[in-house]
Amino acid sequence: MNDKLFEKLLNYYHIDMEGYKSITSPVDESNFALGHSFDHIEEAVALVKEVMSHNGKILIYGDYDADGVMGTSVLVKMFKYVSYPVEYYLPNRYEDGYGLTIKKAQEAIENDIELVITVDNGISAFEPIEILKSKGVKVLIIDHHQAQEILPLADFIIHPILSHFGEVPSSGAFTAFMFSLAFLKRFDKYLSTLAAISLVSDIMPLVSYNRNLLRMVIANYHDREFFQIDALKEDEPFNETTIGLKIAPKINAIGRLIDGDDINRLVAFFTEGDKSQLLSYISWINEVNESRKTASKSASDSLDHYSPDEPAIVHVTDAKEGLLGLIANQLVNKYQVPCIVLTKDKSGDLLKGSCRAPEGFNVVEAFQTLSKYLLAYGGHASAGGCTLDSKNFEIFKAEFIKLVKATPLQKVKKDQISIGITDINEDSYRIIQAFSPFGESWPAPLLSLKRVDTSSLFFSRDEKHILTQIGHSTRLTGFNFPRSEVQQHRFIDLTGHLRINTYRGFKNIEFLISEISSSDKS
């Protein structure tokens, strides 16, 4: 074992051996209480069972992103386990928008729904819930979003923070899963797997109970156990990387692209068992995902005329609103400048946009500064969304670029672990993986190789990428680092991560380069 690397990892994560044992000790079902840790969860279960006792109609109202899909599927499957039929609805991004609406509340009343359960939404649906309650409809909110000081007048609210379960934010599907524990009085492996997927897809902090659930699900996952998950991940191992790069994007693609109520087929996919029908669903999911890739690449390429002397990218595209964040993200990753991509709404009068920015630029603060040009905005430091009148586009663009010019990007210095070329091996990879799963609030360790001689590097045939074999099954890989730029320096420092890459049955341990900097001595 590479003791030096292990010690460096302990320092990197600011933990001692006790902390290491805590994050690596086995987790099992006993780590999860049967729901009683949430305030009022037993009363909420009793409410649901009281409605069931006289065959009352129940509607589960979810959301169009992966967390909303997983949360809705958890609850629908939970009811299937007890053979109780329920109705469910995932809103369409373009026709319904986010969350329970007044229109859908009125439809629920017309359809004699007795109980509405919102999942991954509801905490801000004041008026729709007031309408439901005024007509005697019971409401249970299962949500995780930040609440306002005043809460909706639901019968019960199950929420990780508000219900005093803990202090770490979690996902809607995790919260729904915890409700299923209290309802079923047992731990269900499939439902826990759906919840674990949502922790990664919704970028929840991978600490505390979030980490425990994800670790347990990954450790106990067996191929060919759950057809739906196997079909989504294909031949990849089930872990946080596969969830983030394979599974979640496919689920989210449906909500990004599909019009009408076809998105509800996703819940059927995750909760039904007919093999031929499931094969039809996965074919559809893969087809939509390929369309998502093609559409976002096409839109990104059409906007790809950035000049290095521009401090920001602000463009209007005809791409669907659900793709704007992906397109903006691609451009930010390529050019490392703030980027806003907008598209017209159906009326043509409004522009809806998505903003992404590199570290060091605060998106939501920029929107606050320019709020007089915006009809609505929201988000956080590195990502946000906005709506503006089309007539204000040119002045908004000019003012945003002006603001970026006046706000030089502050390079955020990240902790790194210095290693040598000989440390790029399977043993080092195994030591690092012991600290996984990696994600929000627990990133994969950033590694650095100092003073690499550029004359020792090999490049792809088109000389755009670093592809250097350094051992029988180890190599340096860096995409979009052209020879012409790299070899302007005699020595460079490399920053990146260790990963395992399997291609045509051959396994390589790669140092995947994310950044290079000159280490030539002046």
Segments predicted by a language model, with ranges:
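Short, acidic/hydrophobic/Gly-rich beta-strand patch recurrent on exposed beta strands
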Residues: 315, 466-472, 511-514
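Non-transmembrane, aqueous-exposed alpha-helical and coiled segments at domain scale
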Residues: 406-412
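A short acidic, amphipathic alpha-helical/loop segment
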Residues: 127-132, 327-330, 431
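Accessory interdomain/linker segments of ATP-dependent helicases and helicase-like nucleic-acid enzymes
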Residues: 417-470, 476
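Beta-strand/loop nucleic-acid-binding surfaces
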Residues: 471-486
